């Protein structure tokens, strides 16, 4: 959410959709306009409005403040740590977790003082900021939850940047969760290799690979912006609807407890809600929440094709559902998907099972000798077993 989409009406729609988390920048310059004086009033309203609706918050603590200069240097680094400490103290006990910066590996958000992003210099500067901020935050509020990383893109250069951070001691600092923004790949299923590679980097650096992760930002736009997946432009809305659901499912499969879609509103082509209209992606989310509310992922079923996905979900009453789809090849655009049928063993169930498509339309699949043969496409389908 941004300042023009964080009001009560938008939050009502987010709540109605069934989402549980929102991400919002807490901008340092808008809170500390005079040295040592903090005004949280505009964010108090937002936090209160979220709490009324049961929404939890990722608060992104951004950016430098002209009163102090860039946080790569003193006194700005210490002043940022003071600001972060004041934030977690002021909002102690609220449903907020705190992210240190947004995409600090990029020139866009870290600064133009380097020749390129993802550099050893940027990694050292960011690690120094985290090293200053985390102890101050934990002292002010020992229960605060801190996210570090906020890494933009999952590709060779961002992997190098993370390696530089880890070599500089990032993994020895007592933050709680590593956050990533997995742009740079064509499909959500490509996240799996990217996450595995990053875990290996952590392991190589001697870090705890069991530390929590979240995907704190990723969206798939309609046109040629960052994150564009390609394919037939006339099907852009459809592809976006596929991707938002598959992103949530893949992150769930990978053990990420929180996923943030970029973005709720806006004009960049990522929005779920555009100019008062619900996009196909919005409607797909509505079906997703309705179908899987109360269910937990049990396991991924084995398939002959590694790019076919069949996930089994179960609720507390023993009810079971499958979610099934197929993906393009690694780093291929969505139009490369080849729809096909597969055999899935479902055991002793009703002879006719209800299927629900991406937008909530229902159909029937026949069971023969304990096996169904649904047709897989890039759009996840929900299959109710019992």
Q: What function would you assign to each model-found segment?
A:
Residues 303-349:
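Carbohydrate-binding surface patches
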Residues 13, 17-174, 182-185:
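Substrate-binding cleft and catalytic face of glycoside hydrolase catalytic domains
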Residues 343-361:
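Solvent-exposed beta-hairpin/edge-strand motifs
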Residues 19, 94-95, 175, 256, ...:
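Core-facing hydrophobic residues within beta-strands of well-ordered domains
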Residues 365-386:
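C-terminal beta-strand-rich structural cap/linker in extracellular carbohydrate-active enzymes
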Residues 1-6, 70-75, 230-237:
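Active-site mouth loops of central-metabolism enzymes
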Residues 122-245, 254:
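Noncatalytic carbohydrate-binding groove/subsite architecture in carbohydrate-active enzymes
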Residues 220-292, 298-308:
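Aromatic/acidic polysaccharide-binding cleft in carbohydrate-active enzymes
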